[in-house]
Amino acid sequence: MVSIRPDEISSILKKQIADYDKSVSVSNVGTVLQIGDGIARVYGLEKAMAGELVEFEDGTEGIALNLEDDNVGAVLMGEGLGIQEGSTVKATGKIASVPVGDAMLGRVVNPLGQPVDGNGEIATSDSRLIESLAPGIIKRKSVHEPMQTGITSIDAMIPIGRGQRELIIGDRQTGKTAIAIDTIINQKGQDVVCVYVAVGQKSASVAQVVEVLREKGALEYTIVVNASASEAAALQYLAPYTGAAIAEHFMYQGKATLVIYDDLTKQAQAYRQMSLLLRRPPGREAYPGDVFYCHSRLLERAAKLSDAMGSGSMTALPIIETQAGDVSAYIPTNVISITDGQIFLSADLFNSGLRPAINVGISVSRVGGAAQTKAIKKIAGTLKLELAQFDELAAFSQFASDLDEATQQQLERGKRLRELLKQAQFAPLNLAEQVAVVYAGVKGLIDEVPVEQVTQFAAELREYLKTSKPDYINQVLTEKKLSDDIEAVLKESINEVKSSMLAAA
């Protein structure tokens, strides 16, 4: 028979009492009632907050969006293949946040800030809430510094300033992304941090963009946030806010930032999908009632901060895709009313060979004029008007058989201006080159050059200035204005290039 030794029992009891942890952990737990289509209905979670992160049994995260009487509607930020009815859900008490910092530069991340480029973990300890309040009026300053895109027609006629929101709108395949990528490439050496947010795009297209940025040496100051078409609707909806949060980190450090949302139409569609599955009442075009707020709270985060706040800036270039050029649809009109101007790309102009296919007539920059450099402002004042008049006259001249000399001259000048503004993709021009090209056209110095040779003339002029007149380029780039001396040098250069071209012909 085993003898029971009291001292052994007492020592075991003492050890257990010593090891006893009396701390109590309280967690808000619920049960999955229904799961499917990226939406989970959860019973319980009484204390869940709107927008709170919830964690499912299989590790998938979700966001509590619908707080109803008897259940919580959550959207999944992942596949959620391991989630079953009856499995437990835990409220985390946190709102979605994303890692930020210099370590993010040159990386491709998903909307949760996790790297997807195969280059290892991102070593940063800083994080920032994905949703945060936009700066108030007192914290802002009016837009007054230029954000050069490197695209002559934009910098001359639709100038963009640091801290502005400028919409790029047009049908599919009209060169919207090309303008955005050119703008990123043009920021090289300007100490601007760029964030490119790809929403609902093909992974192959995003890989191509990343490769172009790498080739042009632009990836080192760019962060790419990718929520491809194959990802959950919740991630596509979150991606733009993630991009804004990453840029805000640099903005509040006093840096200039540029964010491209490509495109917000896909984000609105993802939000519509989530809202309809959550059984929220649909409105116009089946979008939920708060889709305007979805975009306005995102774009209001772009700002030029006051000196007291460090003078940082976030410039936003949202992209919207239209159907058959219809800018009066719901999402286009919403975003047009939120932004500080729009660049409208026309499929007809694109197909006629004008690249970038900017329709100058309905494109506008509401605040960029104050930020435009003096050099280009001085000469480009009449450019937009002349091109608009040319479009009108070109349409009229198709029906009129005999035109007076002044009209004929205006048409000829318009054709040459059109040719001058044509630009190759991924080849942004600096300010001095833009000034030279626009000056030659507006002042009528190339009226004798045949239309088909204008593009060649522009290329030769730029090359001549680089090799023979480097002082002109340096002076315009440093002073950013066109003095009488520089203007004389420019005029002489244009005439020399023109003479040699006409002589060769």
Curated annotation (Swiss-Prot):
GO molecular function: ADP binding; ATP binding; proton-transporting ATP synthase activity, rotational mechanism
Gene3D superfamilies assigned to the protein according to its UniProt record, in alphabetical order: 2.40.30.20, ATP synthase alpha/beta chain, C-terminal domain (1.20.150.20), P-loop containing nucleotide triphosphate hydrolases (3.40.50.300)
Taxonomy, superkingdom: Bacteria
Site (Required for activity): 363
Localization per record: Cellular thylakoid membrane
Membrane topology qualifier: Peripheral membrane protein
Major subcellular site: membrane
Catalytic activity: ATP + H2O + 4 H(+)(in) = ADP + phosphate + 5 H(+)(out)
PROSITE patterns: ATPASE_ALPHA_BETA
Positions bound to ATP: 170-177
Cellular component GO terms held in the UniProt record: plasma membrane-derived thylakoid membrane; proton-transporting ATP synthase complex
Assigned EC number: 7.1.2.2
Keyword Thylakoid attached: yes
Stored Pfam families: ATP-synt_ab, ATP-synt_ab_C, ATP-synt_ab_N
Keyword Transmembrane: no
Enzyme's top EC category: translocase
Assigned protein family: Belongs to the ATPase alpha/beta chains family.
Subunit and partners: F-type ATPases have 2 components, CF(1) - the catalytic core - and CF(0) - the membrane proton channel. CF(1) has five subunits: alpha(3), beta(3), gamma(1), delta(1), epsilon(1). CF(0) has four main subunits: a(1), b(1), b'(1) and c(9-12).
Record's function text: Produces ATP from ADP in the presence of a proton gradient across the membrane. The alpha chain is a regulatory subunit.
NCBIfam families in the cross-refs: atpA (TIGR00962), PRK13343.1 (NF009884)
Protein name listed in UniProt: ATP synthase subunit alpha
